[in-house]
Amino acid sequence: MKIRGFEVVTKYKNAGINIPKRSTEHSAGYDIEAAETVSFAPGEIKLIPTGLKAYMQAGEVLYMYDRSSNPRKKGLVLINSVGVIDKDYYNNPDNEGHMFMQMRNFTDEEVVIEKGERVVQGVFMPFLVADGDENQEKEERTGGFGSTGA
């Protein structure tokens, strides 16, 4: 039985996508790479595809954190601060659960992220819910990136 991990989405099956791994024995985060080379104009915000989807158990979430070197070395920041990948994002009908990294170039120069370059770290975590949550009506996820917001 699979508990938690990463899989390559169908579109990138033959694209040489690496399954994320932890760099050291005590690393919390799994290094997630860019699935394609992406160029950013100064000030531009773009989605970088990972070619990956993540599966996990109920009560778990995958947080995607910016690598600490991105602002200093690349002039890029994860624009939403922390990416949140919910369990029901996996295999959603809109995009198969394909995860993207939303980055912004805050420099005055073009910045390029190369295919295979590590961009974010994914950390699986349990989460808690508030009292009365079980009594609140929930929607079923039907879309991909940004689909649960207005």
From Swiss-Prot:
It holds the Pfam family dUTPase. InterPro entries: dUTPase, dUTPase-like, dUTPase-like_sf, dUTPase_trimeric. Its cofactor is Mg(2+). The keyword Metal-binding applies. Pathway: Pyrimidine metabolism; dUMP biosynthesis; dUMP from dCTP (dUTP route): step 2/2. Keywords: Hydrolase, Magnesium, Metal-binding, Nucleotide metabolism. It catalyses: dUTP + H2O = dUMP + diphosphate + H(+). Its EC number is 3.6.1.23. Substrate binds at residues 67-69, 80, 84-86. Transmembrane segments: none annotated. GO terms for molecular function: dUTP diphosphatase activity; magnesium ion binding. The keyword rRNA-binding does not apply. GO terms for biological process: dUMP biosynthetic process; dUTP catabolic process. PANTHER family: DEOXYURIDINE 5'-TRIPHOSPHATE NUCLEOTIDOHYDROLASE. This enzyme is involved in nucleotide metabolism: it produces dUMP, the immediate precursor of thymidine nucleotides and it decreases the intracellular concentration of dUTP so that uracil cannot be incorporated into DNA. Belongs to the dUTPase family. This is Deoxyuridine 5'-triphosphate nucleotidohydrolase. It comes from Lactococcus lactis subsp. lactis (strain IL1403) (Streptococcus lactis).
